Amino acid sequence: MLGHIGINLPDLAAAATYYGPLMPLLDYEPFFSTENALAFMPAEGRRGAYLFFYEATEDRGYTREATGLQHLAFVVPSRDDVRTVHSHVRSAGSTVLHPPQEWPQYPPPYFATFWLDPFGIMLEAVCHHDRD
């Protein structure tokens, strides 16, 4: 099982502003915050990977087509949760790449939305159930 993922970002304060309200919608809660790092853990003691954000010391820009992180996908319990996340990121001004929809090219059921965070990282909320 994956223990944690660390991601460098150019502006940790902006990351806290963006990810603070988003992560509870993805079933994550704050783990810790310092001057140089911000971390979230699976909510309510669930097992899963922790997510750490660090202040980048070099800004080379980000592209998901280059070697490195392509995107992060968060599994949520229901399709309604996918829709809730979609509404939140739209209201936060995120660029939505794909609104909530079925993805028949992936093993079903696969219902997801994709968007970009303020730093250009592609994120996904996905539900692997038929239930709303």
Language model features with spans:
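N-terminal beta-strand motif that seeds the catalytic metal site of vicinal oxygen chelate
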Residues: M1-A16, L72, H129-D132
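Core segments of cupin and vicinal oxygen chelate
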Residues: N8-F52
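Vicinal oxygen chelate
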Residues: L9-A14, A73-T113, P118
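Short glycine-/small-residue motifs
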Residues: Y50, M122-A125
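Long, continuous compositionally biased terminal/linker segments
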Residues: M41-P77, R83-T84, S91
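Short beta->alpha transition motifs characteristic of CBS
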Residues: P107, F114, V126-D132
